Amino acid sequence: MVILGIDPGSRITGFGVIKVQDNKIYYVASGCIRITEITTPKRLKQIADGITQIINIYAPTEAAIEQIFMFQNPMGAIKLGQARGVAMCTLAINNLEVSEYSAKQIKQAVVGTGGAAKSQVQHMVQSLLGLSKKPPEDAADALAIAICHYHSSKSLAKISGASRVSQKRIK
């Protein structure tokens, strides 16, 4: 199984790709899609193009994305929602089923506490994947999303008789 994690953002969208084989997690790739365009439609297209390129290179079999969180600034929430929507649509266009996780779920799965700091997430991602250095924040978050998805799907698979459809309902 190859899992693509996406940490959507209006300026930087992080991505992380892991491979799971024999219940072991292996690092494949990670990075950031840095948005350089000025107009909103071109910014959103840049996100879609970047994710499409990642899908074409790494051929993920599953995808996961962070759920939207509360914003004090309504415009910030709208921009993040647009980026997230484009990311989810691009994944769906490429026939990837998309699972969603809250920031708390992701931190809990990777660090062991839902209130973990960004630096703790970076450190645990580095440790779990055997990386020589901490990945950048957005890439670390995306890798953490992929790791969370693996742990979540592994746990759900243990539930006797849980099909892919019923697993989605359990969430």
UniProtKB/Swiss-Prot annotation:
It catalyses: Endonucleolytic cleavage at a junction such as a reciprocal single-stranded crossover between two homologous DNA duplexes (Holliday junction). The active site is at D7, E66, D138. One of its GO terms (biological process) is DNA recombination. Its EC number is 3.1.21.10. Mg(2+) 2 binds at E66. PROSITE patterns: RUVC. It is an enzyme of class 3 (hydrolase). GO terms for cellular component: cytoplasm; Holliday junction resolvase complex. Binds 2 Mg(2+) ion per subunit. GO terms for molecular function: crossover junction DNA endonuclease activity; DNA binding; magnesium ion binding. Mg(2+) 1 binds at D7, D138. It is found in: Cytoplasm. Pfam families: RuvC (PF02075). Keywords: Cytoplasm, DNA damage, DNA recombination, DNA repair, DNA-binding, Endonuclease, Hydrolase, Magnesium, Metal-binding, Nuclease. InterPro entries: RNaseH-like_sf, RNaseH_sf, X-over_junc_endoDNase_Mg_BS, X-over_junc_endoDNase_RuvC. Its cofactor is Mg(2+). Homodimer which binds Holliday junction (HJ) DNA. The HJ becomes 2-fold symmetrical on binding to RuvC with unstacked arms; it has a different conformation from HJ DNA in complex with RuvA. In the full resolvosome a probable DNA-RuvA(4)-RuvB(12)-RuvC(2) complex forms which resolves the HJ. The RuvA-RuvB-RuvC complex processes Holliday junction (HJ) DNA during genetic recombination and DNA repair. Endonuclease that resolves HJ intermediates. Cleaves cruciform DNA by making single-stranded nicks across the HJ at symmetrical positions within the homologous arms, yielding a 5'-phosphate and a 3'-hydroxyl group; requires a central core of homology in the junction. The consensus cleavage sequence is 5'-(A/T)TT(C/G)-3'. Cleavage occurs on the 3'-side of the TT dinucleotide at the point of strand exchange. Belongs to the RuvC family. HAMAP family: RuvC (MF_00034). This is Crossover junction endodeoxyribonuclease RuvC. The gene is ruvC.
